[in-house]
Amino acid sequence: MTKGILGRKIGMTQVFGENGELIPVTVVEAKENVVLQKKTVEVDGYNAIQVGFEDKKAYKKDAKSNKYANKPAEGHAKKADAAPKRFIREFRNVDVDAYEVGQEVSVDTFVAGDVIDVTGVSKGKGFQGAIKRHGQSRGPMSHGSHFHRAPGSVGMASDASRVFKGQKMPGRMGGNTVTVQNLEVVQVDTENKVILVKGNVPGPKKGLVEIRTSIKKGNK
């Protein structure tokens, strides 16, 4: 069955395995995960738990900042006897009977050796050209060439008379939801509520990440 938790990417470090192997790891801090709602096949058509992460400030009239919860969010969290949450995500195909509304989901949900998928929002790079954004080749930089880093031809002859959708061109790069699959949990620190994940995960430092059981290898 699927397991899941939300956390913040703290950064990268390294640890040593039992055989002395150096392992690069990403530190993910996962605090304040609370089950806000349980969904079942009978009522909702599928099994899932809804998990909230990081508290929001209580409802305040005329508050314009998104740091404050609105009344519907406050009422929804109140059913779980919890504070309103800033981030709410669903984890499907879980053992619903193993969770209760209001229960805290801790890092010991995972153990060392678990294979997981990690989802985050990639770092934003701003407006970039076709070489950096798509890995296209540049032209000659000397010998009279006037073609250096331009994207080259993007259109067709008079038969098509248009640029096809999806043509690789300069534009905004990064800031996309990215999932890295089949990463390994190296260590779980229940005292500091952190998970050490082998390799790197998407997003900047302090970015939100979603950790769940690997969809390909988790149930094998």
From Swiss-Prot:
Start and end residues of each stretch annotated as Disordered: 130-156
Top-level division of the source organism's lineage: Bacteria
Keywords annotated in UniProt: Ribonucleoprotein, Ribosomal protein, RNA-binding, rRNA-binding
GO molecular function annotation: rRNA binding; structural constituent of ribosome
Keyword Lipid biosynthesis assigned: no
Family annotation (InterPro entries): Ribosomal_uL3, Ribosomal_uL3_bac/org-type, Ribosomal_uL3_CS, Transl_B-barrel_sf
SS bond partners: none
Annotated Pfam families: Ribosomal_L3 (PF00297)
Recorded family membership: Belongs to the universal ribosomal protein uL3 family.
Record function comment: One of the primary rRNA binding proteins, it binds directly near the 3'-end of the 23S rRNA, where it nucleates assembly of the 50S subunit.
Subunit structure, as described in the record: Part of the 50S ribosomal subunit. Forms a cluster with proteins L14 and L19.
Protein name: Large ribosomal subunit protein uL3
Organism whose genome encodes this protein: Staphylococcus aureus (strain NCTC 8325 / PS 47)
Lineage: Bacteria, Bacillati, Bacillota, Bacilli, Bacillales
